[in-house]
Structures are given as C-alpha cells and as structure tokens.
Amino acid sequence: MAVLLETTLGDVVIDLYTEERPRACLNFLKLCKIKYYNYCLIHNVQRDFIIQTGDPTGTGRGGESIFGQLYGDQASFFEAEKVPRIKHKKKGTVSMVNNGSDQHGSQFLITTGENLDYLDGVHTVFGEVTEGMDIVKKINETFVDKDFVPYQDIRINHTVILDDPFDDPPDLLIPDRSPEPTKEQLDSGRIGADEEIDDFKGRSAEEVEEIKAEKEAKTQAILLEMVGDLPDADIKPPENVLFVCKLNPVTTDEDLEIIFSRFGPIRSCEVIRDWKTGESLCYAFIEFEKEEDCEKAFFKMDNVLIDDRRIHVDFSQSVAKVKWKGKGGKYTKSDFKEYEKEQDKPANLVLKEKVKPKQDAKYDLILDEQGEDSKSSHSHTSKKHKKKTRHCSEEKEDEEYMPIKNPNQDIYREMGFGHYEEEESCWEKQKNEKRDRRQNRSRSRSRERDGHYSNSHKPKYQTEPYERERSRKRDRSRSPKKSKAKEKSKYR
C-alpha cells in the first residue's frame, strides 16, 4: 500500500492508510494508475506549513476524483472520511484537500510542519511520507512569490504504484504507457523545471570572484545604510579628497596646507583632533578644488617625510560630510567647541539672599499712633472681605451644582424633544429658590450682627441720656402719690 512520486527534485515514497481511509486511498491509487498526476505542478509551497499539488491545471482550482472519471461530472467529488480521526501531528503527513464543502477531488497536500491542529477535521489524512523527506525539505525551501507559487517549476513527472490492495473498477481506462505532456502543461510562464540557473556559466574564475566581491560589497553597503552608518547604499566617496595618515602630532593644518598647495588650490585642510583634549589624532583630510590636482598629490606625496614622519596618502573613503538626498553630514570639531562654550556660560538665574514677605497691595504699614483707628478700619475692611468671599462661595456652589450639559442637547431641542426644556426650567426654579434662601439668611445674620455691634460700641456720652429717658418713663408709670411724696422729700 505505497506509491512512489517521481518529482523534478527527487523521489518521494508515500505509505497509505488503506484500513482507516479506504475511499480516499482508492481514489488516490486509481488516479495514480491512470497517470492523472503526471506533470502536475506543485502550485502552493508555504514554508514550514504545507506543499500542495494534484491539480492538472496548476491553478489550485481544478481536479476531480476517480469517480468523476468513471461516472461523470456529478461524481467529481466524494464525501470526506472523518472517522477514525487522524491528526496532523508530524511532518510528511499526506491529506486530501477539502474543496470547501467537506468533499475531496484529486488535490492533496504534504505537511512540512508539526502539530498543525487547525488542519484537523478539515482535510482528510490518508498517508505519510516514509522515504524522501530530504526532497520534501528541498521543496519546502524553494523560492516563491507572494501567492506561494515557486519561481521555478517543480513537477510530478511520474507515479509508480508499489502495492495496490483494491480491485480496478470495470470501466477504468488504464494507459499502456505514460502520456506525453502538452505545451499547455509545460508552459507555466515561469522558469522551466529543466532550466539551469547559473550566473557564472562561461566565466573565468577571476570574473566570478569579481562578481562575488561586488555583490558582497553591495550587501555590506545596504547593511550599513540600514544601521545608519551610510546616508545611502549607492553613495560614493568624493574623488577630490585625500586621506593623510601617520602624521607627527606637532603637524598643524597650516603646515599641511602649505605643503600640498603646490599641486593646486585647496578648499579645506583639517587635521583631526580629539574634541575634548585638542590633541592631534595623526591623520587629516585635504580637499582640492580639482580632481586632477588631487591625483597629482596622491602620486607625489605618498611616503614623503614631514616633521620627521613618513606619511601615507590615499584617496578618502569617508562620506561623513557628504550631503545626499537630505542625509549625511556629521558634527565637526567646531560644533563641539561651540557646545562646550554654551555649557560654560553662567546661567541667568541668580539665588536671592532673602525672601520677600508676602504683602497685600491694599494694606500699608500702620504707625503706633494710629492704632485705635486702624483697628476699626481693619474690622470694617475685614467685613467687606468676608462679604466678598461669601459671594464668591455662593457662585462656586451654583457652579458645583450645575448639571453636565449634553453636547447633543441643542440638536434634540431642534428635533422636537421637549423634555430637555422642561428639565432646564425646573433646574432654573430650584436654582433661584436656593439663591433667595441664601440671601435671606445672609440679610438676617447681617442685621443681628449690626445690632450687636451698635450696642457694644456706643460711647458713654451717648448712653447716659438714654438711661435718663428710661428712668423718667419709669417714674411716670408709677403712682402719683409716691411721686408727690418724693417731691416733698426733696424740698425738706
């Protein structure tokens, strides 16, 4: 109960579960017997997931079962066998592909991943790969496009039945030999299965090494661009800049400019120094106005003795100061010096020796002579202040009890929902009543306070006549006999 698949990459042997899946195995064996799978494309390769094939059209939407070959289009698909349940646990599991309605045709898949539980109950497992897992691994690692179709054709060239326990149906037409492929089958619009992809064919070993070196340099440039060390992968260093190294630490910019200026005008000459200590790093960059002058200096000045040092001159490979598509450009020594100067500047903020006491702008200092008058004025102003604070507190309370306004309130009012207007009127009434209560309370309290204040703060010369009047009233209210006796006693 096994079938050998001869592919363009190698042979694969599949063992079938004929006892657990008799109908699916019968369908697969008889399709192999009539050479239905010959020259079928492997049209779906999803790495570490599945390899799908079995469609003669190569689109993934075709194919029919052996029963369709025998009984017509009404039998193109057969029902899936779900009992007993076999899971997609290991690599190399072979399953019939579900057409979307729990039916199978001719397409099947081989798993290239483990524990694919989401395939269980959807696609019917009917076998496993026992030989040729290395070929399955090769197919799994092939290059594919966005639709998971391989760029180079991978086909099933031939199928060989190693063991078939099922009898052939009476109307089954078995060909004597394998049929030849048609042009439509072989023309997939992609790289042919028998085509060799060799970029180095017909080239010498030196040319091959040069091509490899160029590819490696390009890869490294792209990597440096991704990291951020290069502004662009296609950028080239300037051809009018020389790199001079092995300098004496005492050599200055002016010395180098004077020496190299005999080859032509120089735009800039800079000895690179440590931005902290200012000491020379013993290398420099010299930029000429013309490339010809730069080439002359390169050939003439290499290994020349300057300040008791043999210098080395080469073309600069640095692109640090090159502006390219809005990128590039680095901080220079002068930038760091300016930054240090800004840091060394004294701050504008100054600490004060004493903190000024907080004073109210409405009140001034009071002299000792005006102590009594100040007390009365202070009490009067404090009353005003209390009244103001009370008024502010009332306004705050009104604000605190204000309801949260619905942003859709105006829209609802226009649409005719009147309950919002009723709620507003009720709220205004309640608000006015509360305000009246507060005002009445404040008035009564102020009256009581004013009466108490007037009685307690009246001077003595105002209280004496008041007491005399009260005594007179008392005398009048008494009986006339007693009053006459009192008068007589006065004149005795």
UniProtKB/Swiss-Prot annotation:
Residue numbers carrying Phosphoserine: S178, S393, S471
Primary localisation category: nucleus
Region (Disordered): 167-188, 368-409, 423-492
PROSITE patterns recorded: CSA_PPIASE_2 (PS50072), RRM (PS50102)
Matching InterPro entries: CRIP (IPR035542), Cyclophilin-like_dom_sf (IPR029000), Cyclophilin-type_PPIase_dom (IPR002130), Cyclophilin_PPIL4 (IPR035538), Nucleotide-bd_a/b_plait_sf (IPR012677), RBD_domain_sf (IPR035979), RRM_dom (IPR000504)
A molecular function GO annotation: peptidyl-prolyl cis-trans isomerase activity
Enzyme Commission designation: 5.2.1.8
UniProt keyword terms in alphabetical order: Isomerase, Isopeptide bond, Nucleus, Phosphoprotein, RNA-binding, Rotamase, Ubl conjugation
Major enzyme class: isomerase
Residues with Phosphothreonine modification: T182
KW Iron (keyword) present: no
Crosslinked residue numbers (Glycyl lysine isopeptide (Lys-Gly) (interchain with G-Cter in SUMO2)): K201, K212, K218, K321, K362, K405, K460
KW Metal-binding (keyword) present: no
Subcellular location: Nucleus
Boundaries of every RRM domain copy: 240-318
Feature: compositional bias, Basic and acidic residues: 177-187, 426-436
PPIase cyclophilin-type domain location: 1-161
Composition bias, Basic residues: 377-390, 473-485
Family membership: Belongs to the cyclophilin-type PPIase family. PPIL4 subfamily.
Function: PPIases accelerate the folding of proteins. It catalyzes the cis-trans isomerization of proline imidic peptide bonds in oligopeptides.
Protein name listed in UniProt: Peptidyl-prolyl cis-trans isomerase-like 4
Gene source species: Mus musculus (Mouse)
Lineage, uppermost ranks: Eukaryota, Metazoa, Chordata, Craniata, Vertebrata
Gene name per UniProt: Ppil4
